[in-house]
Amino acid sequence: MRSQAHTPGRRFLAQSAGLLVAFLTAHLAPAATTERHPAHSPEEALKLFQLEAGLRIELVAAEPLVINPVAFVFDGPRRLFVAEGRGYPDPVEGSGQTTAGRIALLEDRDGDGRFERRSEFAADLGYVNGLALWRGGIFVTAAPDILYLKDTDGDGVADKREIVLTGFDATKTAQLRVSHPTLGLDGKIYVTSGLNGGKVTSPAHTGRAAVTFSLKDGRFDPDTYAFENTSGRGQFGLTFDAFGRRFFCSNRHPVMQIMLEPAHLARNPHLSFSESVQEVSKVQAEAAVFPISRASITADFIPSLMAAPHAGTFTSASGVFIFGGTGLTPEHQGNVFICESAQNLVQRQVLRPEGAAFRSDPPAAGKEFLASTDVWFRPVFLGEGPDGALYLADMYRREIDHPRYVPLESRALLDFESGKDRGRIYRIVRATPTPSADDATYRDRRDDLTKTVRALESPDEWWRADAQRRLVERADRAAVPLVETIAAQATRAESRTRALWTLHGLHSLTTPTIAAALNDPHPGVREQALHFAGELIARGQGAQLLPAAIAATRDGDARVRFCAALALAGSRDETVVPALAALVVRDGEDRWTRAAVLSGIAGRMDAFLAALQREPAAKPAAIAAVMEHLGRVFGAGASLDSCRQFLNDRLSEKGERSSRVSAVLGLVEGFRGRSGAKTAAQTDTFAAVLGAEGRASATVRDFLRFVAERAGDSQALLGDRLSAVALLGHSNFDFAGAPLGQLLAARQPPDIQVQAVRALERLGDPRGGALLIKRDNWAGYTPRLREAVLATLTAKPALIIGLFDAIQAGIVTAPEISSVRRTQLLKHADATVRQRAETLFQSLEGGDRMQVYRTYRPLLSAPTDVARGREAFLKTCSACHTHRGVGGKVGPDITGIRNQPADAILLHILVPNYEVAPNYQTLSIVTQDGRSLSGWLAAESESSLTLRTAAGGEESIARSQLTSLVASGLSLMPDGLEQTMAKEDMANLVAFLKSEN
């Protein structure tokens, strides 16, 4: 089951055909919705806001001056460029491109705080959704293009219009496209992928190869248009804090932080770590919001379909923005603000350091920064003005959802048109604001070099960013000594940071300036210095900076230490290795610092291990985590002799055994996945590394006996047991079969059961498959465990025949095999497998899923039993989905699904491929050792990818091990769930999902 509230479209808004007939009989039309909740004038709408105490909200522009604003950017006091997403929600996916998009230039010429003049800067554009200033013009995202527009004659209309990049996917709906161009400290313009991608080229540089833009965000050079992928996968929202840390958002994920870029992970091709993003805020069902409007606004004209209003969760997080102005109070500076358009509010969260990353939470529960009772209020974008105030774009429309996500027969009931002629922009300031000193100081004087440099010292982030951009554009070397003074002496750390990056943009950042910044009293400035030092060190030009960078591994700030690891990872100097070892012992429990350190040890793993062993003992958990990852790196990339030595050393070590088990597990996992290891037939990885004689040694036998005992020890820590169970999967079935079979028992913790299944699959012995599919065992499996078993039995050819036999014998029913797995088996390379699959699945592969939906829909009007619905959820859905904290994490958390109409829920249970979000589409992978895996891509790097499987686990696969990778476009959720329960239980299931408790 999949709720649209949890996917990158919007929430699904279906209404049932029975109600459709009833409403048509009563002459209900879409206009009735609007009449029941009419639009308010701009003045009336202001009265409906609930704003945080001590602040006030002011209208600065409204229709007809501005229509459907989706993004804006100030190019100076009283001048505002606005991207107008006119025509939204047109076009329906696949129906072609709109040309209704426009860019408006608004001006406040009389200085009264409201814009009164509009120039049509550009018209006849596609769906525009982002703006960025550069050299007197603006970059505009309007998939499939990024354009550059400029007014060269001063009439307020762009007469220069150039496509600088093209090839971005424009086949999906408007909210799933490249967006949010944002100038970073480094002078590059960053964009979100919109959860789609493309093949990006520049018409101005036809000789360049196309850049595959997929599952990543990106950036480009504003002068050369060179485009590259970056980490992250944002939908509509991208922001930087004052120290250049990048954050983004996506519907159910309000705040995420980029921790590692592709270049960092590419330094060590043997590091099987593909994550790059930290969830900063709470997500999905835990990401609470507190609307004061009706949260179920999309269907609130059919009260019988909706449960009572309640405090909801983020379903449409967008426009994430870190505020750096003085127009609010000091406590608001550095806070992150997120729009939630579906529920008519803006949430504020406070950022706090947490290890190398950040976390964020609302300052208080139960009340939002800004909310409205007006269901037409649709905040989508936030920004800061030259006056230090927070500005907000409100699309102001009846429906924010896209009709693509509404069943065709129900679209006529919803009013997607009202609001196409409306839009508002607001300013939020302190209730008793003071005029911005910067506004008065710098207005109309930005062509003066000295004044522009002075703006770097502004307390407002807008002026600091404006000054940096103008100085870099101007490229006047006369500014260099002035900027160097600010870098050394400015009171604000934010100003010193901007000055450093301005010097970098002017190609005038010197080693002494970097060295001084490495000793700056503020950790944010030291981070910047380490970035610059790392660039020089990697080029072999940073010898003078190396001692200070090494000293930074002992810094009192965790993020500075993390940045030091990234900086030193590019050095080949032997003095770096002990520093990295000491750092990872101190911060080994922080996964980002651990990954940063291990990214830099390619080619010197033996030296790193020796340095690590010289370090004093630290927390066992930290050492275990480090040793497992180090073992993986050894196994994947070291010579066979080095791997053998590493393994023998760990087997013969004395003392604490948990880190030994972790290290050995990492080594054999890494070795088994390496290219050319030839372990497809040799399933005993210990024998593959040590040879037959070494495998038969007493040391190995004793160690494996201990591992088997630890795996079954109910008193041991769960993490230690899981490592031991996984390690059994690298021995052989004769030794490990019996203990693994015992771990399938219902009395064992679920994680242990699933790990035992994976270990049996790794052994690859048909006897393991037979053990998994024994009638008595199968009957006692929970849904999660069944999913794990089915994933195992379809992963290797040797096990598939046993599964077929079990289906034929009635132990397993055919509908329990998902559509993705059925397709995999029906297209298998082995003709025997294909033929048996065709025989077994023939009855399931035909038929019209929408007809099934139409057949079941009338059941929704019958009496239901919520308790039986809960039983149906636990039996059928909980293996993959979490609901109120119960269940798996294969698919989205569906706790918030109760806000949807009943037949919308039914539709996506019965027709799971009705709409599949890009990040939940199934990938099918075949590896060099013959494994077949299906799942969705959880993360990827240059050298590996991580697959979230239907069994609920994650599999990291080195790209070098891929034989094939195919995206099916299908959901992992199977067709035919109705065949697993009685008809009335389907209605009971829907009732449970919509219930209060």
Predicted segment positions?
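C-terminal capping alpha-helices of c-type cytochrome domains
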Residues: 60, 80, 136-138, 144, ...
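Beta-propeller domains with acidic blade repeats across secreted/periplasmic ectodomains
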Residues: 30-451, 470-472, 885-886, 959-960, ...
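C-type cytochrome heme c attachment motif
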Residues: 318-319, 388-389, 423-424, 482, ...
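Bacterial N-terminal signal peptides that target proteins for export
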Residues: 2-17
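Bacterial N-terminal signal peptides
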Residues: 15-27
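Long, ordered, helix-rich scaffold segments
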Residues: 393, 415-421, 429-872, 890, ...
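Axial heme c-ligation environment in periplasmic c-type cytochrome domains
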Residues: 788-790, 794, 808-829, 888-895, ...
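Sequence context surrounding c-type heme c attachment/ligation sites in exported
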Residues: 402, 424-425, 838, 845-846, ...
